[in-house]
């Protein structure tokens, strides 16, 4: 194990000791630091310490001591590691100064067979140009970003080397459009899952929103729909995400702060007042308590008179990435996976148009991973879900078409586009070859994209409009099915109505003014993009081999493998930013003195109002009916799940019992507490 990973493991052991003594106190302290204002709750992503140290700390952002290898950057051993790194850089700079020049043929010949024309160009035109004007790393302010040969080192944001020029020599000898790309709407889906691209239907403009009370969030939803939004995405507050009611001691000071507070069916009814759920697609970013919140949504639709078979939307419900990155887990992994598969089975039977999971790489990337790690870990999470469902006895072609994904769109324009293109091809290969899916809809990867909250800066926040515009354009050129674009003020606080509208308008400019939606996969055939796409695909399968050898993602998580990989990547990125090898405009270069903009403030009165509502609800509901429903839920949760027979779902499936409890107005906290009594709670192990 290298020094960085060893220190990450040491730090995780320190954090892992306290929960055994005081789990409740540990949860409240650590989760406030980890989750407050995270992308899951506000749309900006997890502002990990690796960014806040340099970019400025958000009022709702991640604390600088968040886990998995970040806090140890202050450790003496790590400082020594960093000093060695800087000395090595200085030595390379000295070598470069002594060097008369860089051989222009070296990069041209490295790992490839250039054409005679390219060789001639390198020896003549390029050589003369380098003599007159040496190359300088773009995005490096200090001049330390040099290769071993003394020449400028150009990389993607993830550190992948980038050549000066890409030609046919950078692609496999057998590369052809027919073999490697195919056509839109046809396998392997590199060029998209729809034959008409965005000509038939634009991507869904789904702005992530939720704050304070259900009443206030409902007003924001109506506002967004009025201004051209055609989908909704619900951000829940921290207590809801962790399965606590607003009047729980854990919730004090957190109610409505980084999302909307939803305690009961009554709150969900208010949240969607005036919104036709049969005509509006809704995404809900909720994980451990996903079954309870989804049940509330279904009952609201039922009360509106909607047909469950016609409603469409997405439940995030991706618990694996919580253990890897976001840390909003409640139950142990196996029990959590059981609840996820329950929703697969129930959804396949009763809500065939509703996506019962959105397998998320967004949070993995926000935690500091590279683009490749985001791609590989996210898709392999999908592999794990399919395998668990098949072990339950479910047919992959019944639940497979409703699996969806959620990716991050970061700053490196071409790397992100390549990631999206590779993702579709990889998923097709896995579903067809590994799992034997016959239904072509099971082969399709459909995904939502959100721009990178972790890339936003608190300094000069208007610059964030340009950042998210480029990130959003990359998602569109990569073929996303829906898109959220972060608001420019989200590094500081929850977005205001004005900043949220600006983010929506930016999507609309891309859609209606840029021409990006006029043609399908316009960067196909670019030697650079095709090389990046192949590298992403090959790199992902290399990770899959490692994860297979560990016994799957749950086993890998228990060993800490993905967590350590992300910690290492985040450390490397942060060091490069602090050394100004990577420029962040307005934060570590082009800095000015400025006044802070006006931000949205959530008062403490929200919590008091939610407590009063809960007290009134418990006074008027049938509490005996609630007690009976919760007891049935506990009995079902204790049963061994198995596949249903004769067209029916399993008797052990928890969803029908959760629905019964919801109809009786049991609260989120009461439902989650019933499951805690059966499953217990999870405390992350130390990693070595």
How should each PLM-predicted stretch be described?
Residues 88-266, 271-278, 301-304, 542-545, ...:
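Acidic/polar, glycine-rich intrinsically disordered N-terminal extensions of enzymes
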Residues 395-399, 437-451, 459-488, 495-520, ...:
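Flexible glycine/proline-rich, aromatic-decorated loop/lid segments
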């Amino acid at each position: 194990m290298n020094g960085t990973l060893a220190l990450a493991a040491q730090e995780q052991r320190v954090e892992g000791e306290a929960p055994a003594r005081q789990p409740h106190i540990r949860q409240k302290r650590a989760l406030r630091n980890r989750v407050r204002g995270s992308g899951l709750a506000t749309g900006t992503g997890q502002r990990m310490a690796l960014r806040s140290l340099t970019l400025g700390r958000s009022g709702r952002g991640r604390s600088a001591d968040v886990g998995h290898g970040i806090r140890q950057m202050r450790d003496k051993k790590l400082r020594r590691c960093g000093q060695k790194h800087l000395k090595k850089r200085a030595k390379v700079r000295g070598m470069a100064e002594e060097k008369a020049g860089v051989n222009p043929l070296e990069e041209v010949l490295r790992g490839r067979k250039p054409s005679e024309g390219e060789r001639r160009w390198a020896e003549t035109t390029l050589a003369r140009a380098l003599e007159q004007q040496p190359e300088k790393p773009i995005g490096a302010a200090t001049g330390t970003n040099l290769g071993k040969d003394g020449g400028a080192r150009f990389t993607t944001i993830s550190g992948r080397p980038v050549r000066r020029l890409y030609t046919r020599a950078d692609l496999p000898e057998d590369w052809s459009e027919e073999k490697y790309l195919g056509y839109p709407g046809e396998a392997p889906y590199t060029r998209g899952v729809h034959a008409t691209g965005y000509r038939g239907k634009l991507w869904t403009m789904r702005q992530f929103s939720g704050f304070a009370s259900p009443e206030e969030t409902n007003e924001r939803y109506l506002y967004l729909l009025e201004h051209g939004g055609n989908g909704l995405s619900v951000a829940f507050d921290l207590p809801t995400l962790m399965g606590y009611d607003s009047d729980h001691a854990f919730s004090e000071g957190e109610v409505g702060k980084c999302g909307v507070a939803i305690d009961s069916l009554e709150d969900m009814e208010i949240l969607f007042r005036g919104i036709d759920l049969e005509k509006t697609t809704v995404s809900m970013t909720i994980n451990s308590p996903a079954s309870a919140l989804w049940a509330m949504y279904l009952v609201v639709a039922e009360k509106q008179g909607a047909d469950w078979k016609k409603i469409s939307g997405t439940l995030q419900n991706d618990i694996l990435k919580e253990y890897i990155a976001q840390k909003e887990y409640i139950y142990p992994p196996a029990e959590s996976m059981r609840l996820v598969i329950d929703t697969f089975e129930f959804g396949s039977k009763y809500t065939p148009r509703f996506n019962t999971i959105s397998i998320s790489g967004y949070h993995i990337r926000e935690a500091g991973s590279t683009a490749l790690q985001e791609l590989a870990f996210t898709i392999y999470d999908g592999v794990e879900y399919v395998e668990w469902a098949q072990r339950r006895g479910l047919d992959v072609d019944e639940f497979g078409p409703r699996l969806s994904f959620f990716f991050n769109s970061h700053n490196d324009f071409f790397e992100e586009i390549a990631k999206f293109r590779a993702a579709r091809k990889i998923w097709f290969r896995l579903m067809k070859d590994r799992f034997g899916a016959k239904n072509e809809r099971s082969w399709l990867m459909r995904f939502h994209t959100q721009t990178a909250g972790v890339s936003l800066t608190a300094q000069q926040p208007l610059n964030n409009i340009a950042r998210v515009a480029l990130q959003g354009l990359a998602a569109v050129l990569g073929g996303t099915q829906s898109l959220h674009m972060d608001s420019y003020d989200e590094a500081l606080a929850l977005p205001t109505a004005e900043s949220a509208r600006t983010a929506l308008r930016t999507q609309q400019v891309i859609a209606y003014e840029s021409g990006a939606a006029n043609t399908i996969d316009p960067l196909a055939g670019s030697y650079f993009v095709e090389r990046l796409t192949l590298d992403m695909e090959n790199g992902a399968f290399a990770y899959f081999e490692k994860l297979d050898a560990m016994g799957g993602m749950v086993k890998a998580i228990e060993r800490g493998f993905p967590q350590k990989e992300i910690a290492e990547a985040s450390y490397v990125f942060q060091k490069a930013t602090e050394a100004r090898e990577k420029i962040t405009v307005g934060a570590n270069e082009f800095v000015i003195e400025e006044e802070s903009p006006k931000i949205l403030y959530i008062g403490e009165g929200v919590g008091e109002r939610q407590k009063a509502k809960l007290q009134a609800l418990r006074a008027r509901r049938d509490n005996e009916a609630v007690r009976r429903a919760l007891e049935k839920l506990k009995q079902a949760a204790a049963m061994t799940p198995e596949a249903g027979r004769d067209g029916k779902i399993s008797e052990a499936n928890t969803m029908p019992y959760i629905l019964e409890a919801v109809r009786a107005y049991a609260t989120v906290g009461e439902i989650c507490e019933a499951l805690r009594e059966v499953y217990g709670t999870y405390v992350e192990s130390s990693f070595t």
